[in-house]
Structures are given as structure tokens and as C-alpha cells.
A protein has these predicted regions:
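C-terminal lobe and adjacent flexible extensions of AdoMet/dcAdoMet transferase-like proteins
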Residues: 210, 229-290
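Catalytic cores of RNA-modifying enzymes
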Residues: 1-230, 261, 272, 281-288
Length: 290
């Protein structure tokens, strides 16, 4: 297996110039040019020769080379067709890599895992475009894809939101959704100078290890997340007002007040004060009203 040779500014510039590549803002392209960060990502993902790895947004193949050297198979999905000939060049010596030119949100990942990995859990590794981080991660979790872990580069602010608890300014619907499905752990903070071009914000590598089973028992998961969204759509409103004003919910003011009281919460409590367990209790109480 060929050793990785990309991952530094000089080699990246050489490849980009060779193909006269122009960065596309609409794709949120920021390529990693720091080998230490690449090592941290691959090590955090705990890739072995048994693993099937889905890489989202391989760029010029920098991290793909690292992944291919460690995994059984890498399936790289790249939306920018201008990068496909570059990937075919930089990855030509890696026989265990498949490249697909497609929007990851249009890929049937569950079917992919079944066909390429026998339905066993896959590992997802990516330097994600920041503008589409949440739809990708939630799509993976909510789509019932068999996943072992997701190790990704994201905007630092988003990584912080994924792992915080109640009572903090970053706590919200994303925190609760991620923590329902996985155990989040920030591996490293990454400064802008580790990318080309440099992003205007700080970044972080976060690993999301899928729970074998959710940490709370919920009779209606969809309802729980409707309640969560309603609780944070207007953060400064009380929980009762947030639920009453939600277009996703149809409970009366009296029903809402009765459920909140039955769960033992103060009348003026806000959603930002509730734990995942508390939201599960709320959802289960509302289910009984049906």
C-alpha cells in the first residue's frame, strides 16, 4: 500500500496548480494541510483493517490516503465534479478506494452499508462543509444507517453545541439530538492556518460514538424532538409558551400546563433548563393524552 504523501501546503498547491483547480464557495471547500491534524482524525476514528469507511467530501484525497492506508475499504463521496479527476490521480495507487461524484444527502447510505459491508456498522470520517454539517449528521442518525462512529471536522461553535449540557448558552436542539444518538467527544481544536484556504472561524474534530441503545426510553421519538424544537425556537419564552406556540404541536394550553406540573417542573421553567431525560419524560406524558 502506498504511503500517504499529501497533507502539506507544498503538495496541495502542486496538485491544485496541476489541475488549475478553483475553490468553490458554494461547496464550503477548505482543504486540510496539516499532517498532525490528519493523524489525530484517523487515530480518533480508530480505523482498522476490518473497517468500511465512508468519507464525505474528500477534496483532493488528502485524508482519503490516510484512511485507505488504515481501512479495509474507503467509499469517498464528493459533490464537486471538478475534483473527480484529481481524486482519480491522487488515489490511483489505492485499490481499496471507491469514488462517487454525488451529493451525500442524495446517497442511500443504508443501502450502501448493506451492499458493501453486509449491513454491519460503518465508520464515517469527514472534513465537513460547515454550511451543511447538521443536515448531514442528523441524516446519518435519523436514517437508521448502521453506524459505529462519526469522526468529523466541524466549526468549533457547532462542536461545542453538540457536547454541552443544560443551562449553557450553546445548549439547544442540536445538543439533545446528538446526545440522544451518540456520545460526543471533542478530540482537538484546529486553528484556521491548518486549512487552505483559511476559514474565518475556528474548527474542531469531534467523535460521535453511536449508542448501542438510546440513553432514555421514549415512546414517540418524533414527538420528543418536536417538543425539543418548540422549546428552543424562542429561547427566552417559558416552556409552556414555546409548546403552545409551536405549529408542530396541537396540545391545548391546559394540557400543556397539566403535563408540565405532572412532570414536577416549575410553571415558568424554560426549555434550556431541561435535560434529555426531562424531555423524554415530557414526551411520554404527552403520549398518554392521545
Amino acid at each position: 500500500m502506498t504511503a500517504p504523501y499529501l497533507g502539506n501546503p507544498k503538495r496541495t498547491i502542486e496538485v491544485l496548480q496541476k489541475y488549475e483547480f478553483v475553490f468553490q464557495k458554494k461547496f464550503g471547500q477548505n482543504f486540510l494541510i496539516d499532517t498532525h491534524v490528519l493523524d489525530k482524525i484517523v487515530n480518533a476514528a480508530e480505523i482498522t483493517k476490518e473497517d468500511f469507511v465512508l468519507e464525505i467530501g474528500p477534496g483532493i484525497g488528502t485524508m482519503t490516503q490516510y484512511l485507505a492506508s488504515a481501512a479495509r475499504e474507503v467509499f469517498a463521496v464528493e459533490i464537486d465534479k471538478a475534483l473527480i479527476p484529481i481524486l482519480e490521480d491522487t488515489l490511483q495507487d489505492y485499490e481499496n478506494v471507491t469514488i462517487l461524484n454525488e451529493d451525500i444527502l442524495k446517497v442511500d447510505i443504508r443501502k450502501l452499508a448493506e451492499e458493501r459491508n453486509g449491513g454491519k456498522p460503518i465508520k464515517v470520517v469527514a472534513n465537513l462543509p460547515y454550511y451543511i454539517t447538521t443536515p448531514i449528521i442528523m441524516g446519518l442518525f435519523e436514517g437508521e444507517v448502521p453506524i459505529d462512529s462519526i469522526t468529523v471536522m466541524v466549526q468549533k461553535e457547532v462542536a461545542d453545541r453538540m457536547q454541552v449540557g443544560p443551562g449553557t448558552k450553546d445548549y439547544g436542539a442540536l445538543s439533545l439530538a446528538v446526545q440522544y444518538y451518540a456520545e460526543p467527544y471533542i478530540v482537538a481544536n484546529v486553528p484556521p492556518n491548518c486549512f487552505m484556504p483559511r476559514p474565518k472561524v475556528g474548527s474542531a474534530v469531534i467523535r460521535l460514538t453511536r449508542h448501542e441503545k438510546p440513553p432514555v426510553a421514549v415512546e414517540d421519538t418524533k414527538l420528543m424532538f418536536c417538543i425539543i424544537r418548540a422549546s428552543f425556537n424562542q429561547r427566552r419564552k417559558t416552556l409552556a409558551n414555546g409548546l403552545k406556540n409551536s405549529p408542530e404541536l396541537s396540545f391545548t394550553k391546559e394540557e400543556i400546563q397539566n403535563v408540565i406540573a405532572a412532570c414536577g417542573f416549575p410553571e415558568g421553567i424554560r426549555g434550556e433548563a431541561l435535560t434529555l431525560e426531562a424531555f423524554a419524560a415530557l414526551a411520554n406524558a404527552f403520549v398518554k393524552l392521545r
